[in-house]
Amino acid sequence: MSTHHGPLRVGIGGPVGSGKTALMDLLCKSMRERYDIAAITNDIYTKWDAEFLVRSGSLTPDRIAGVETGGCPHTAIREDASMNLAAVAEMRSKFPGLDLVLIESGGDNLAATFSPELADLTIYVIDVSAGDKIPSKGGPGITRSDLLVINKIDLAPYVGASLDKMDADARRMRGERPFVMTNLKTREGLERILSFIETKGGLKPKADTA
């Protein structure tokens, strides 16, 4: 479903290696039959994440765009989102019926947030392998994202992380804002993310938009 300014735009951020691109891949593959989707990735000097999505068959190549942000990927999603806004506009011109655009941030800035001008909903991905103190450290991604994803829960026993502590800290730091524990390799928790995007974003599957 398109909003007043076009498709629903979901920003996906988080540290390098947390599972952002894996989540992008799964969301595309899980939603592409029901919605008209495009994906935009941000990398500093390459288009590696976009190329990964193409190789994985997430969407057809013409629906995937890679933005090369240069040295400051944080700026490209926040202070000066013009490159990403241009990429969204190009996708809309190619696919006028777009329902959903997924936008993956680049870089490793733990404080990176999406401009409201660029993203309608934000998902922040962290992973258990970075330690169970991450949720308690706060920062805008942890406290203010619309949905927090705590990924790689299967690694907890191997890195000495307590999922109970991460759960309690996430509740304390986020208040009423939702979070999901996931193992994206096995798709555990994926349905809750899909449900969040559809419900919070007001998406209606193609079959329902007669």
Swiss-Prot record:
Domain of life: Bacteria
Major subcellular location class: cytoplasm
Assigned GO CC terms: cytoplasm
Keyword NAD belongs to the record: no
Keywords: Chaperone, Cytoplasm, GTP-binding, Nickel insertion, Nucleotide-binding
Keyword GTP-binding: yes
Gene Ontology molecular function, alphabetical: GTP binding; GTPase activity; nickel cation binding
Compartment list: Cytoplasm
One GO biological process term: urea catabolic process
Binding site for GTP: 14-21
Similarity section: Belongs to the SIMIBI class G3E GTPase family. UreG subfamily.
Oligomer and partners: Homodimer. UreD, UreF and UreG form a complex that acts as a GTP-hydrolysis-dependent molecular chaperone, activating the urease apoprotein by helping to assemble the nickel containing metallocenter of UreC. The UreE protein probably delivers the nickel.
Function: Facilitates the functional incorporation of the urease nickel metallocenter. This process requires GTP hydrolysis, probably effectuated by UreG.
PANTHER family assigned: UREASE ACCESSORY PROTEIN G
Protein name per Swiss-Prot or TrEMBL: Urease accessory protein UreG
Chain's gene name: ureG
